[in-house]
Amino acid sequence: MAMALPMPGPQEAVVFEDVAVYFTRIEWSCLAPDQQALYRDVMLENYGNLASLGFLVAKPALISLLEQGEEPGALILQVAEQSVAKASLCTDSRMEAGIMESPLQRKLSRQAGLPGTVWGCLPWGHPVGGHPAPPHPHGGPEDGSDKPTHPRAREHSASPRVLQEDLGRPVGSSAPRYRCVCGKAFRYNSLLLRHQIIHTGAKPFQCTECGKAFKQSSILLRHQLIHTEEKPFQCGECGKAFRQSTQLAAHHRVHTRERPYACGECGKAFSRSSRLLQHQKFHTGEKPFACTECGKAFCRRFTLNEHGRIHSGERPYRCLRCGQRFIRGSSLLKHHRLHAQEGAQDGGVGQGALLGAAQRPQAGDPPHECPVCGRPFRHNSLLLLHLRLHTGEKPFECAECGKAFGRKSNLTLHQKIHTKEKPFACTECGKAFRRSYTLNEHYRLHSGERPYRCRACGRACSRLSTLIQHQKVHGREPGEDTEGRRAPCWAS
């Protein structure tokens, strides 16, 4: 177990008083309700950290009151009276004694802005709980008056702004005083105790709904939003709400088109760091997701799940027009192009009709469902992009040759033809290609792999296009039996 090692000096015993903060009744009454709630949360979290590390024997009386939801009241006053010598020290004396001001004290002091009082250091001569203050250590007045004699005390009494500036400054030396056995140093015991939970693996904060435990109370509060379905962070552009501010910040990049995460290898930029990490696996060749049936590995878990359907025979994608089922969604999209072409020739499916149907969802339907094929989408923007497959709309046109595309990514890929860029090179023979999947097809020439097999004669092919061309020998058109092209029995 990691122990607290003060720097410098011998090892100190950690008790609740090291991380506790006490107030007088006057100070407590100056706090707003949200500040009092902050005090309760921090005290309970500090106690939980100590308990998880095994430093506590008996539960402090302050914690018992806070757990019951009662006001600390008289207990705070009693502790303050017992600690009047500490509370009466001026700022210089506190620095000499090595008394460190906690972050909670500074935060509450800045929020409260108590005039004439440095937090935990009353104006000299101010009675605490009816008890007179002891003689001033710097030769201050002994007549019981509450006039400040400290050089900065008069400024504090006159200007709350100067007080807040002082409260924002660390008291004492800025060097860390507590060091963990792992080498990391902290200025406060409470921060060290929170860090030590990493080494112990303790998770003292448990969710009452599902039983899941967490290392910090802040993470527990964030988790509990899942059960309450509360989404306090709302986008000002589209109104979509999120549970976390980080999710909202990532969502904003959809509207601003900002892509701050760039790949160091190829320069491609992404709006989220997770997508950049996923992309970098293509350069490193890392394939962490392996199939338990055949051992084949993949870069993405989604691709592994698709591959698993080859072994299980599952075909979750069904065409609503003809009932044909497919393993992959991409196969279904290719199949729908046949229906879209037929509908365009008959005048039955047009862009306006599809968009109108998409904007008129029926009762009980998902909010974003394709009116032609029934495929659901989480966002309306994805549905509109998908509808171009049915309408044949191609808004992205090449400035060089005038060829149009339904997606900007396809246009970018096409433009490599004009720039003659071929970023994907074979490591065996050095031949380069514009597309990664063309390189993968080329690799089969070296490996001898032929995954596409004809059902009629059993002939295997290394490319899908070669198999489609071969099927014409048996009297099949390329558009027929689209499902069979990627069926499990076709793979060798």
UniProtKB/Swiss-Prot annotation:
GO CC annotations on file: nucleus
Ranges that cross the membrane: none
UniProt-recorded Gene Ontology molecular function terms: DNA-binding transcription factor activity, RNA polymerase II-specific; RNA polymerase II transcription regulatory region sequence-specific DNA binding; zinc ion binding
Coiled coil: none
Keyword Thylakoid: no
Subcellular location: Nucleus
InterPro entries: C2H2-ZF_domain, KRAB, KRAB_dom_sf, Znf_C2H2_sf, Znf_C2H2_type
Biased composition, class Basic and acidic residues, residue ranges: 139-168, 474-486
Annotated region (Disordered), positions in chain: 129-170, 472-492
Keywords from the named record: DNA-binding, Metal-binding, Nucleus, Repeat, Transcription, Transcription regulation, Zinc, Zinc-finger
Domain KRAB: 14-85
Top-level taxon of the source organism: Eukaryota
C2H2-type zinc finger segments: 178-199, 205-227, 233-255, 261-283, 289-311, 317-339, 368-390, 396-418, 424-446, 452-474
Gene3D superfamilies membership: 6.10.140.140, Classic Zinc Finger (3.30.160.60)
A biological process term (GO) from this entry: regulation of transcription by RNA polymerase II
Family: Belongs to the krueppel C2H2-type zinc-finger protein family.
Function of the molecule: May be involved in transcriptional regulation.
Stated name of the protein: Zinc finger protein 517
